[in-house]
Every structure is written in structure tokens, then in C-alpha cells.
UniProtKB/Swiss-Prot annotation:
Listed name of the protein: Cytochrome b
Main location: mitochondrion
Gene3D superfamilies: Cytochrome Bc1 Complex, Chain C
Oligomeric form and interacting partners: The cytochrome bc1 complex contains 11 subunits: 3 respiratory subunits (MT-CYB, CYC1 and UQCRFS1), 2 core proteins (UQCRC1 and UQCRC2) and 6 low-molecular weight proteins (UQCRH/QCR6, UQCRB/QCR7, UQCRQ/QCR8, UQCR10/QCR9, UQCR11/QCR10 and a cleavage product of UQCRFS1). This cytochrome bc1 complex then forms a dimer.
Chain sites annotated for binding heme b b566: H97, H196
Cellular component terms per the entry's GO annotation: mitochondrial inner membrane; respiratory chain complex III
Domain of life where this protein originates: Eukaryota
Gene encoding the protein: MT-CYB
Classification of source organism: Eukaryota, Metazoa, Chordata, Craniata, Vertebrata
InterPro entries associated with the record: Cyt_b/b6_C, Cyt_b/b6_C_sf, Cyt_b/b6_N, Cytb/b6-like_sf, Cytochrome_b, Cytochrome_b_C_euk/bac, Cytochrome_b_N_euk/bac, Di-haem_cyt_TM
Co-factor remark: Binds 2 heme b groups non-covalently.
């Protein structure tokens, strides 16, 4: 008799995705981040659910309801900080996951790559709206500044912003709808992640060499289940160190001041994981130009497969491309630093140079480097 695992309609799906899945024998720890992102998502949904049981999405009580969660709810403080820092861990995993895809040429699976880009946008939208919910100073002003960017869209901009706000400023209606969207989006992300995985399993995983590995596959369980569990334990260790030792390390002190529309904080800045995009936005003096650059800084990922000029898929054996890749990483770290600095000299100039370098690397230098490498190998 065949094992129920292989015959039952539901068990069969799980079996083919997590147990008997043929996986390349040489995938490194950089392939752990998919499962870690799944772990983060489940953690965020669970902690978020428990927070939603005690949170009130009303401008008069939102701030105090978060304080109530931290002070009066049993283990409310740990749930709140796991949720806040869980978002940071989520984005660390996301950036590493995307970076892995760029380095090893995983973008050559277009469906998987494109659903991944949609997932990235959905996650960024969710995180932004979540940051507004505690209704501190940075929540309020962050929401005001970022939503106001849409007013740069010609003709419909102003109407669009007022439609999103539900009034003439960020107020009760805005907070209520942001809470509703923040609650529903993770479930949409979960559905998109399932589609992402479905597309991945159509082609099978890529591997560090970028060479098809059909001739050398091993079962996912036990080899990669144990590897994923180790990854999850390390993720949990990092998260709990953040939560228990320095829960406010990545937050903004201004968010411990209740939202006040009459008092603007000296430096309005988003959470650390948006700073690179914020720096690109600020480096262009024109409002519409800045908004376009902001969107394109992420949307540029969609044309990466079209810019692939190399005869090899992975960067593993391409030293010139490797140098440019790590230059891109350094550039993104520079942009992240600049995004957190006030908009004054010399930070403005550094931000502009880093923004130019970011787009130049992806659109011009990396494709040229690939062509040079092809010629060096006489291909």
C-alpha cells in the first residue's frame, strides 16, 4: 500500500513541496531565506493577531492602547516588540533573498522573480501602514509625508491624496483604513507567497553554479528541512536578542510622543528599511521626479532579466560582475545611511552621487561588465 503522504490530496501537496521535493545538492545557506521569510510571515501574522485583539484604531485611543498592551496585557510587551522587530528581521531576510537572486541569476525564472517583486511591494506597503498605527509623532508625520507624495501625480494627484486620507488631512478615517489594510495585506502576501512557490516548483531551484542540476538532485527532507530549522533557530536567536536586550534600537524616539498635527518633528524619516529609497527620493529636487525615482528604485528589478548580457547565469565565475555587485551593496548601505541624515550639505551631494551610482550600476555598468567577461572567455 502506498503511503498516505503520497496519495491524500492535501498531504500530497505538502509532500511535493516540503518532503519529496527534488532539490539541487549544492545550494548554500543563501537559499535559506525563502523559508525564513515564510517563518517571519507566520510570526508577524500571529503576533499581529494578538495585538489586534487589544489595539483600537481611533486617533484618541490608538497611542494609549499600544501603551496599554505594553503595560497591562500579559506578555503584551514581548508580543509588541516581537512584531515591531519581526518586521526588521523580515526586511533583512527580504534584502538578502533579493540580493541572492541578483548574484546567482535567479531572476532567469521570470514568473518567480515577478511575483517576488509584487511580494516586495506588498510587504513594503504593509510595513508602512503598520508604522502609522501606534499614532506617535513619526507615525503621523511619516503618513503625511509619504501619502502626500502622490499629490505629485499630474491632474489627479490632489484628489487621490484626499481620497486616501478620507478627508483633508491624515486623521481618524486614515488611521482606521490603514488598520484595515494592515490587517488584510499579510493574508494577501501569504497567497502571493504560495503562488511564488508554485512558480518556483515548476522550474526547480537554481543553484550557486547557475548550471542545471537535474542530474544531481536530493530529497528536500531530511537534508534541507534540518538546514531550514537551523536557519529558523538562528533567526529566532537574533530576533529575541533584539526584543529582550534592545527592543527600541531600530525604532525612532519620536514615536514615543503622541501624534500632534501642530508640531512637526525636526527630522522626519521612515523606518531603517525604507531609508535607501527615501534617500533616492530626496536626492532629486523635483517632487514628481523624486517620486518616480523612488518607485523605479524597486521597479528596476523587473527589467533585470532583460539586462542580463552574460553567457553565464550566476556571478560565481565572473569576478568583474562580482566587484560591481559588492559595489552596489556598499552603495545601498551608503544610501541607507544618507536617508537617516538631515537634508543638508554634504549629505545631499553624497545622496545624489549614490543615487546616480545605483541606477548606473544596474542599467549600464553591470551589463557592460558581462559583455567584457564574455569576450575575455572568447564566447
Amino acid at each position: 500500500m502506498t503511503n498516505i503522504r503520497k496519495t491524500h490530496p492535501l498531504a500530497k501537496i505538502i509532500n511535493n513541496s516540503l518532503i519529496d521535493l527534488p532539490a539541487p545538492s549544492n545550494i548554500s545557506a543563501w537559499w535559506n531565506f525563502g523559508s525564513l521569510l515564510g517563518t517571519c510571515l507566520i510570526l508577524q501574522i500571529l503576533t499581529g493577531l494578538f495585538l489586534a485583539m487589544h489595539y483600537t484604531s481611533d486617533t484618541t485611543t490608538a497611542f494609549s492602547s499600544v501603551a496599554h498592551i505594553c503595560r497591562d496585557v500579559n506578555y503584551g510587551w514581548i508580543i509588541r516588540y516581537m512584531h515591531a522587530n519581526g518586521a526588521s528581521m523580515f526586511f533583512i531576510c527580504l534584502f538578502l533573498h533579493v540580493g541572492r537572486g541578483l548574484y546567482y541569476g535567479s531572476y532567469m525564472f521570470p514568473e518567480t522573480w515577478n511575483t517576488g517583486i509584487i511580494l516586495l511591494f506588498a510587504t513594503m506597503a504593509t510595513a508602512f501602514m503598520g508604522y502609522v498605527l501606534p499614532w506617535g509623532q513619526m507615525s503621523f508625520w511619516g503618513a503625511t509625508v509619504i501619502t502626500n507624495l502622490l499629490s505629485a501625480i499630474p491632474y489627479i494627484g490632489t484628489s487621490l491624496v484626499e481620497w486616501i486620507w478620507g478627508g483633508f488631512s491624515v486623521d481618524k478615517a486614515t488611521l482606521t483604513r490603514f488598520f484595515a489594510f494592515h490587517f488584510i495585506l499579510p493574508f494577501i502576501i501569504l497567497a502571493l507567497a504560495t503562488i511564488h512557490l508554485l512558480f518556483l516548483h515548476e522550474t526547480g531551484s537554481n543553484n550557486p553554479s547557475g548550471i542545471p542540476s537535474n542530474s544531481d538532485k536530493i530529497p528536500f527532507h531530511p537534508y534541507y528541512t534540518i538546514k531550514d530549522i537551523l536557519g529558523a533557530l538562528l533567526l529566532a536567536l537574533m530576533l529575541m536578542m533584539l526584543v529582550l536586550f534592545s527592543p527600541d534600537l531600530l525604532g525612532d524616539p519620536d514615536n514615543y510622543t503622541p501624534a500632534n498635527p501642530l508640531n512637526t518633528p525636526p527630522h522626519i524619516k521612515p523606518e531603517w528599511y525604507f531609508l535607501f529609497a527615501y534617500a533616492i527620493l530626496r536626492s532629486i529636487p523635483n517632487k514628481l521626479g523624486g517620486v518616480l525615482a523612488l518607485v523605479l528604485s524597486i521597479l528596476i528589478l523587473a527589467i533585470i532579466p532583460l539586462l542580463h548580457t552574460s553567457k553565464q547565469r550566476s556571478m560565481m565565475f565572473r569576478p568583474l560582475s562580482q566587484c560591481l555587485f559588492w559595489l552596489l551593496v556598499a552603495d545601498l548601505l551608503t544610501l541607507t545611511w544618507i536617508g537617516g541624515q538631515p537634508a543638508e550639505h554634504p549629505f545631499i551631494t553624497i545622496g545624489q552621487l549614490a543615487s546616480i551610482l545605483y541606477f548606473t550600476l544596474l542599467l549600464i555598468l553591470m551589463p557592460i561588465a558581462s559583455i567584457i567577461e564574455n569576450n575575455l572567455l572568447k564566447w
